[in-house]
Each structure stands twice: as structure tokens, then as C-alpha cells.
Amino acid sequence: MAILKPFNLNQWIDENRHLLKPPVGNKNIYVDSEDYIVMIVAGPNARKDYHYNETEELFYQLEGEITVYVQDNGEKKAMKLSAGDMYLHPAKTPHSPNRSEGSIGLVIEQKRAGTNAKDGLLWFCENCNNKLYDVYFPLTDIEKDFLHHFEHFYNSKDLRTCTKCGTVMESDPRFTVK
């Protein structure tokens, strides 16, 4: 990566808010970095999936609030962050970042392209926390690679139906094919 001049992150956010739109609302700000994905992520989002990453992720909340739901030994737990709060999320622990309206956060994680590392997306029943579906894949572009998997899950009633209690997770209209 070439040496880049420092820049004012708050100014960058103000100039690029129009790019930070749902459903995921993220923008990689150092695309040419060889080692890290450095993203600004905006809310609101309504993701019901959990992300699996084989490396740690750093969350720093700049504006508003985020709740990072985690799956810890079969139990759903909530990590709440307000502006100024930071959280280092452990590797190999499914997590679901849920951002409030108007929130902005910085997320830093290691690049996985060119490694044997796999990313994963998992969905859990909202009633009993039973795992509904999971998929693991090599990540090459964090702004694009999740979309296909979201569409596959939300367009299948079978995948969204809990085999333990029968609850059906609502389909997300942003990812369903009409």
C-alpha cells in the first residue's frame, strides 16, 4: 500500500454519508490496505444474521448506539456501545451488529483474501435460539460478498423455519426476489 496522507475522519464521514445506506451501510475506507479492512458502518440496519470471523474485530462507536449480539456457548448476549465506546470482539464467535438510526461506527478487521480463513453467516431462531442455518465462504469483498447469502436465506421459508420450535423468521424484503 502506498503512503497516504492523514485525513479528518469526521469530515470524511460528513462528505460520504450518502454512501452509508442500508441494508448493510458499510464503506471500506482503505481499499488498498494489504492487511486490514477499515470500515465506516452506519445505521440503521436490521440484520438478523450472525457473522463468523476467524479473526478478532474491533468496534469503535463514533455516533449513536450499537448493540452487538453474540452467541456465547449457545446463549445470546448483548454488548451495548454508545458514542466513544470500544469493543474488541473475539475470533470465531458469532456476532450480530445492530445499529440504531443515525449511528456511525468504525470497524477494523483483518483481511482474509488469499488465506484459508472462512467467513460465515449464521441465523438463529428468535424464539428459542436454535441455529436455523449457516454458510461458510471465502471473503474477498466485504461490501458485496454477503448479499448472495442473504438472498438465499431470506428466499427460503424452509431455511427460516426452526426445526426445534417451528417459529418462522420473517423474510427481509430488501433481500427477497419478487
Functional labels for PLM-detected ranges:
Residues 41, 79-101, 109-110:
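Conserved metal-binding segment of the jelly-roll/cupin
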Residues 40, 48-53, 70, 78-79, ...:
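Short histidine-centered beta-strand/loop micro-motifs
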Residues 1-42, 47-49, 150-178:
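A short, N-terminal "cap"/entry segment at the start of jelly-roll beta-barrel domains
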Residues 52-83:
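A short beta-strand-loop-beta hairpin characteristic of the jelly-roll/cupin
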Residues 123-128, 162-165:
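Short cysteine-rich clusters marking metal-coordination/redox-active sites
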Residues 33, 44-58, 74-75, 101:
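A short beta-loop-beta micro-motif enriched in histidine and acidic residues
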Residues 111-121, 149-157:
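Short, flexible, mixed-charge glycine/proline-rich loop motifs
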Residues 134-137, 171-172:
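Short, non-ligating residues that shape and space the ligands of small metal-coordination modules
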